[in-house]
């Protein structure tokens, strides 16, 4: 199950420059992080759901690519984002 419309709107308003900024790198990474954390809870209950695990790995890979792009463009925005999201890197 994907995120609700309200949850997505809150993430966009929190991480975007305005309420309609859904395409910025920060917003995309934040949305992927929310979906990944939602799926991690799913896998705690459904350990053998390999089909969805493939989707999870795809999301993690996409988030990694976006973070690498942001790190190359603006290191300050990158460090700010990973601190706000609580990511390891």
Curated annotation (Swiss-Prot):
Specify the taxonomic lineage.
Answer: Bacteria, Pseudomonadati, Pseudomonadota, Gammaproteobacteria, Enterobacterales
Q: Subunit details for this protein?
A: Part of the 30S ribosomal subunit. Forms a bridge to the 50S subunit in the 70S ribosome, contacting the 23S rRNA.
User: Keywords in UniProt for this one?
Assistant: Ribonucleoprotein, Ribosomal protein, RNA-binding, rRNA-binding
- Free-text function comment from the UniProt entry: One of the primary rRNA binding proteins, it binds directly to 16S rRNA where it helps nucleate assembly of the platform of the 30S subunit by binding and bridging several RNA helices of the 16S rRNA.
GO aspect biological process, one term: translation
Supply the InterPro entries for this chain.
Answer: Ribosomal_uS15, Ribosomal_uS15_bac-type, uS15_NS1_RNA-bd_sf
Highest taxon listed in the record's lineage: Bacteria
Q: Name one Pfam family in it.
A: Ribosomal_S15
Instruction: Report the protein name in the record.
Output: Small ribosomal subunit protein uS15
Report the family membership: Belongs to the universal ribosomal protein uS15 family.
Q: List the Gene Ontology MF annotations in alphabetical order.
A: rRNA binding; structural constituent of ribosome
Q: What CDD domains does the entry give?
A: Ribosomal_S15p_S13e
GO cellular component terms, semicolon-separated: cytosolic small ribosomal subunit
């Amino acid at each position: 199950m994907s995120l609700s419309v309200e949850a997505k709107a809150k993430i966009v308003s929190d991480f975007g420059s305005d309420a309609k900024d859904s395409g910025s790198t920060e917003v995309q990474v934040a949305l992927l992080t929310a979906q990944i954390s939602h799926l991690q809870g799913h896998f705690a209950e459904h350990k053998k759901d390999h089909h969805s695990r493939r989707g999870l790995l795809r999301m993690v890979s996409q988030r990694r690519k976006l973070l690498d792009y942001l790190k190359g463009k603006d290191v300050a925005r990158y460090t700010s984002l990973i601190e706000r999201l609580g990511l390891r890197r």
